């Protein structure tokens, strides 16, 4: 415990909070170009082929980002928008690609949680024709 005199002289040091998404540099989103698009397997006990992309950002960083949803149209040199948000069972993946913006298309035939996957509202006739 410091004395009152020591506190007057030095004061308390404020701890700096470490960013969980340093590559965004304080922005909500960043634009980037895909360098590699591949699949990887998650940690135990999960099993799947998760789609990920290595992205070179406008901030100069190169990060690994997750591609959410079923199916995607990304390939090398695709321009994508990145947001923060880790994937719990993929170590080192701390960013998500935003679906439905820039070169990334929205998820096809998605009806629920459409805004999260960049899917436009289906036409009234199209929904009736499917049934």
UniProtKB/Swiss-Prot annotation:
Family label: Belongs to the universal ribosomal protein uS12 family.
Region of interest (Disordered), residue spans: 1-22, 102-131
Residues recorded with modification 3-methylthioaspartic acid: 89
Record function comment: With S4 and S5 plays an important role in translational accuracy. Interacts with and stabilizes bases of the 16S rRNA that are involved in tRNA selection in the A site and with the mRNA backbone. Located at the interface of the 30S and 50S subunits, it traverses the body of the 30S subunit contacting proteins on the other side and probably holding the rRNA structure together. The combined cluster of proteins S8, S12 and S17 appears to hold together the shoulder and platform of the 30S subunit.
Pfam families in the record: Ribosom_S12_S23
The keyword Ribosomal protein is annotated on this UniProt entry: yes
Compositional bias annotation for Basic residues: 9-20, 113-131
PROSITE patterns attached to this UniProt entry: RIBOSOMAL_S12 (PS00055)
Recorded GO CC terms: ribosome; small ribosomal subunit
GO molecular function, one term: structural constituent of ribosome
GO BP annotation list: translation
The protein's name: Small ribosomal subunit protein uS12
Name of the coding gene: rpsL
Oligomer status and interactors: Part of the 30S ribosomal subunit. Contacts proteins S8 and S17. May interact with IF1 in the 30S initiation complex.
Alphabetical UniProt keywords: Methylation, Ribonucleoprotein, Ribosomal protein, RNA-binding, rRNA-binding, tRNA-binding
């Amino acid at each position: 415990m410091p004395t009152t005199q020591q506190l007057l002289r030095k004061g308390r040091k404020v701890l700096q909070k470490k960013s969980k998404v340093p590559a965004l540099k304080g922005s909500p989103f960043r634009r980037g170009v895909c360098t590699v698009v591949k699949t990887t397997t998650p940690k135990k006990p999960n099993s799947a082929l998760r789609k990920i992309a290595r992205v070179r950002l406008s901030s100069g960083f190169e990060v690994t980002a997750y591609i959410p949803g079923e199916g995607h149209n990304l390939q090398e040199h695709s321009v994508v928008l990145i947001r923060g948000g880790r994937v719990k069972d993929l170590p080192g993946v701390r960013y998500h690609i935003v679906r439905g913006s820039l070169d990334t298309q929205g998820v096809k035939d998605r009806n629920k949680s459409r805004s999260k996957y960049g899917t436009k509202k289906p036409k009234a006739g199209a929904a009736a024709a499917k049934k």
